[in-house]
Amino acid sequence: MAAVLESLLREEVPVAAAVRWIARSTPSSEDSSEVAALSALRPLRKEFVPFLLNFLREQSSRVLPQGPSTPAKTPVASAALPARQGAPARGGRGARSQLFPAAEPLSAAAEAPLARRAGRRRGPGPGPSRERGGRGSGAAEEGASGESPPWAGGRKPKGSGSPGSPRLSLSDPPNLSNLEEFPPVGTVPPGSAGRTKPSRRINPTPVSEERSLSKPKTCFTSPPISCVPSSQPSTLDTSPWGLGLPPGCRSLQEEREMLRKARTKQLQQSPTPASPIPESGSPVPSRTGNLTAEPADPARVSSRQRLELVALIYSSCIAENLVPNLFLELFFVLQLLTARRMVATKDSDLESSQGALDSLDTPLFRSIHDCVFFAVQVLEHQFQVLSYLDKGTLKLLAENERLLCFSPALQGRLRAAYEGSVAKVSLVIPPSAQAVSFQPETDNRANFSSDRAFHTFKKQRDVFYEVLREWEDHHEEPSWDFEKGLGSRIRAMMGQLSAACSHSHFVRLFQKQLLQMCQSPGGAGGSVLGEAPDVLNMLGADKLGRLRQLQERLIAPQSSGGPCPPPTFPGCQGFFRDFIMSASSFHFNQHLMDSLSLKIRELNGLRLPQHEPGDEDGESDMDWQGERRQFAVVLLSLRLLAKFLGFVAFLPYRGHEPPPTRELQDSILALRSQVPPVLDIRALLQQGLWARRAVLTVPWLVEFLSFADHIVPLLDYYRSVFTLLLRLHRSLVLSKENEGEMCFLNKLLLLAVLGWLFQIPTVPEDLFFLEDGQVDAFEVTTTASEHGLDSVPVVDQQLLYTCCPYIGELRKLLASWVSGSSGRSGGFVRKITPTTTSSLGALPLQTSQGLQAQLAEAFFHNQPPSLRRTVEFVAERIGSNCVKHIKATLVADLVHQAESLLQEQLVARGQEGGDPAQLLESLCSQLCPHGAQALTQGREFCQRKSPTAVRALLPEETPAAVLSSAENIAVGLATEKACSWLSANITALIRREVKAAVSRMLRAQGPEPTARVERRGCSRACEHHAPLPSHLISEIKFHHCSLQDVLSLAAGPRDPEEGVSPEHLEQLLNQMGQSLRCRQFLCPTAEQHLAKCSVELASLLVADQIPILGPPTQHRLERGHARRLLHMLLSLWKDDFQGPVPLQLLLSPRNVGLLADTRPREWDLLLFLLRELVEKDLMGHLEIEACLGRLNEAQWPGDFSEELSTLFRLFLAEPHLLEPQLRACELMQPNRGTVLAQS
């Protein structure tokens, strides 16, 4: 694989062709000549991507990055990185490596070696040792841990075949002054003292002047970049203050230098040193430590062309989903962007490789300038993904001074994306729900075997909530332990649940409480038996948004465990996890698995929104937002249930390490392969992919598999599931935006969760890099049907960050760079700007809304749950009806006013007309201010309708006081819902409706505008005796002899006696014409419905698909009757319809396909209709040609396709032929003259 990379660096093979060669098992014809140089390396093709990732990690070994070390799940190519002699093989599985491998120890006289990593290794293996980042408490902290030497993971030193790393010497003289390797006699080793909690020295922070947007701003809670405090722990931080500093010491650097000397001197005299202290003048090269950021300069970039080429290769692999984790690579790139310094290497090493820039022996990153340049190049290729990140991350990227210096164009694009983004991700966790109420339909006496079992269940339910309340009160105390405090009570409670029915009832209670408490993001919230009061609303602060941001930063977890955190149970989920562990009940676990499986199947099959509302459906905006919220609730519930199902199902098999021997592993595999899965996830996954519901199925399935043990991925059943997921991952290419494919954010969510799954420690490292032939049997398509969830934008940034909180690590990494300090918790510092409290309490009127909410909550707490549901239902429907009422009354009146004003302007201007845009702006400026009446009318509507609805739905026996309170609460909730929507959307709604009316009138304006204006209403002689449109539509929908029945008779199977007479068709069209000419009661919706039905009738007439009543020999309409009916329809379209008629449907594949079922096929009516449409200016030649072109692209039977092509050529060549009669046999003749003669 090193040869492949060198060929790319020497530009012997184009990058695009090489990426296609890597991504496909069979190269295409156009790539065969370009990748001929790589044909000999085809067996090693799958190893190129892991080699490239490890190569980049090795090249960045001397970089001191910002933030924690990041894992890379990449097996090492054995061809490029041979195994160390004597190291045992591990079945072909690669080893684990850090994104930033070990830094090289410097000279003994100048630098102290890095501290060895405290985390354990999985064992020897070929290539760099790989370790999982952020694994709970076991992960090493940034400030106190360095890296092990490069040869500690089994890699050969430089000169033995490991490319890219600096040359290391094994014969360096020992550093006798290093107190870590050579401590003084009689002292305690540093490791024991390092476990004591050190005191923290507070460094003074100088106040700097305000900086521009492109420079990071400092606050008083974090030091500036130039004064980063040392992250080396020390228990002697307070002692040097008594040593007396000289009065002339004015520099912080001098002060630190003296403190180092004092610590070194005192440490040599003290019997218990805290940590190794380097000698004076030799700073410890920690990750950020006490090193200031080195400025990056684009002019000092070395090997610019080489870096651009490697960045292009790397970005192409990311774009084609050839890397396991997209966001892990972005985190690595941002670490390069925010790297502070590089550990210096020997000058001889760099000089020896100056001549071969295209060789892998030459370091890729020689300086910070190279790192930043490479990172910016990759970010430019990944801008599409960056633009979908949250608003805070975009702001930090746009303000990064290095990015501005290296690529002002990218910085401008990021700033534009930030200004246009509305993706504000909130981390505030809503309070948890109350306790599960009594369920009379399932928890009554009739569902238990005896009175004793019933009373035992009620008692155990009370014990369960006592345990939950005690956990809530004490779980945040450091000295409190769940098992010691609650374990015995839980096991005693489970022992009394002896009957199976008692277990099933308790499991149902357990599951419902789990969903109520943990369904919110993070799963943490307020009290169990009642929501905590909203303190912020009670304060009534002037800047409530600032206080909410402060609340968000205080209660949100600071870090999710790095970009690849292990599966955990945050917040309230920890209680349920510990409860299951302490119960240790096989009966309870089995009932719980059954209940969770059933609920997952139920939610996974739930019918969810399948379409996105269009621009014309303004009234359904609120309903669409509600449907998106419903999808989010269902998805989060599925992920929560699947997480606990996986935890319980794989709990008996989970262990820290895989089986030690191959024989033991084979025996376990043979045994486990006979055990059926607890849930048929393979069938559910295949159903989700076929139904285009992967965006709902895959996230919860990933949660289930994340708790699998080491044996699960080796079982054939689960191996096929992982292979199917891998195929799906490779098909989710973000750059493909074809029509009908999966939405971008839907793809991004799936890529994020799948990438996280592939980094789980129990998933084999080589699983992601399977050969294409091993996954060809599982074909996956991302082209979504019109009825699939995948094509609907149901995922937004809030849901993306809720399901994948580790994406927020990108923002925390950039924020730590701005703050200038890595801190002690992984390099992330949260800046909090304090808000003054002088105005708190000065606005008593602003607390009324909060008091009303508390009073309503107290009222519902003392009433049955059905009362709350009734009031909320009434408020929801009355609010929605209010919006529709405002649109039908106020907005409709304003539209009529706009039409009248437009008529006056058209009459006054005559033939001159005017600019439509100016007319629209003029009308909107006059009418939009009247939208303020919507709030007043909305309040009146809610006050008038809500009490009536509440009284109708509540029982008659409801007390008057309760009824009155419920009515008032319903009025308030409905008014708040309606007014909030109207205040935000009424102006846009008025503009949209006025624009539609203006466009419709301008299209209808002809050479005689006065006549057109007069024709919009009824004629003066109209007596309004025409059939009402509502009656006509009712007949179309329900009456047995109606136009809809005609269409139904023609469309489906029917009895021989069913049919319609030509006289009835003429009568029905005459009634339609009367209704269209009498405009008094005709609304646009009814007119659109009639227009669509008339077009469908014309299509059936052309295809001769209407059954006719009469003798048995006559089943088709005569040509004369059909032409007369088509003439009537053309007249209606031309003279009577004033709205748009969807004439394009006449040439849709569905309607033209009706001719395929006719034997013999006759095309004269279609030719006649097309010619008349052109002559009456109802459709243009170009429009018909476009429709015909789309028809030719459709899939037809062979003979039908030839007839269509011949007919279209005749129409386009001879558009004015007099009524030709063409049959199918005539269209198949090759000679056009014969066809015309027979016509």
Curated annotation (Swiss-Prot):
GO cellular component: cytoplasm; endomembrane system; membrane; nucleus
Record's keyword terms, sorted: Acetylation, Cytoplasm, Membrane, Nucleus, Phosphoprotein, Transmembrane, Transmembrane helix
Record's subcellular location: Cytoplasm; Nucleus; Membrane
GO biological process assignments: chromatin organization; import into nucleus; nuclear envelope organization; protein localization
Tissues of expression: Widely expressed in adult mice, the highest levels can be measured in erythropoietic cells.
Record-listed Phosphothreonine modification sites: 70
Bilayer disposition of the protein: Multi-pass membrane protein
Reported consequences of knocking out the gene: Embryonic lethal; embryos die before 7.5 days of gestation.
Residue positions where N-acetylalanine is found in the record: 2
Record bears the keyword Phosphoprotein: yes
Start and end residues of each stretch annotated as Disordered: 61-249, 261-299
Identification of the protein by name: Codanin-1
